[in-house]
From Swiss-Prot:
Keywords: Biological rhythms. The KaiABC complex composition changes during the circadian cycle to control KaiC phosphorylation. Complexes KaiC(6), KaiA(2-4):KaiC(6), KaiB(6):KaiC(6) and KaiC(6):KaiB(6):KaiA(12) are among the most important forms, many form cooperatively. Undergoes a major conformational rearrangment; in the free state forms homotetramers as a dimer of dimers. When bound to the CI domain of KaiC switches to a monomeric thioredoxin-fold (KaiB(fs)). KaiB(fs) binds CikA, leading it to dephosphorylate phospho-RpaA. Has 2 forms, fold switches to a thioredoxin-like fold (KaiB(fs)) when bound to KaiC. InterPro entries: Circ_KaiB, KaiB-like, KaiB_domain, Thioredoxin-like_sf. One of its GO terms (biological process) is circadian rhythm. Belongs to the KaiB family. Key component of the KaiABC oscillator complex, which constitutes the main circadian regulator in cyanobacteria. Complex composition changes during the circadian cycle to control KaiC phosphorylation. KaiA stimulates KaiC autophosphorylation, while KaiB sequesters KaiA, leading to KaiC autodephosphorylation. Phospho-Ser-431 KaiC accumulation triggers binding of KaiB to form the KaiB(6):KaiC(6) complex, leading to changes in output regulators CikA and SasA. KaiB switches to a thioredoxin-like fold (KaiB(fs)) when bound to KaiC. This is Circadian clock oscillator protein KaiB. NCBIfam families: circ_KaiB, PRK09301.1. The keyword Ribonucleoprotein does not apply. The keyword DNA-binding does not apply.
Length: 119
């Protein structure tokens, strides 16, 4: 099986508000569950670093950006729905594609075993 991709993410928040902290907690939970060891997350407080928000054209918080692997994807607002976050960042598709590839390979191996035993 191919090595897993490394995911580079940026979470833009506005201070230590309950909404920002909830977004960070939920996101860390998703990443540790689904992508443990293959992600880097940078949290950017736009109140402390407004120039970074301006450079990256961030207009609202929380905003989550997937930088790598391409394409860049963003989710703005509520990050509490795990599936919405994964789909919005094209991460669920990657997860399903990896599982689909594994399933396809397993099916092919089973078919080969069946064909060999029939002959």
């Amino acid at each position: 099986m191919s090595p897993r991709k490394t995911y580079i993410l940026k979470l833009y928040v506005a201070g230590n508000t309950p909404n920002s902290m909830r977004a960070l907690k939920t996101l860390r939970n998703i990443l540790e569950t689904e992508f443990k060891g293959v992600y880097a997350l940078k949290v950017i407080d736009v109140l402390k670093n407004p120039q970074l928000a301006e450079e990256d054209k961030i207009l609202a918080t929380p905003t989550l950006s997937k930088i790598l692997p391409p394409p860049v994807r963003r989710i703005i607002g509520d990050l509490s729905d795990r599936e919405r976050v994964l789909i919005g960042l094209d991460l669920l598709y990657d997860e399903l594609a990896d599982n689909s590839l594994t399933s396809t390979l397993m099916d092919a191996l089973e078919d080969a075993d069946t064909t060999d035993s029939d002959s």
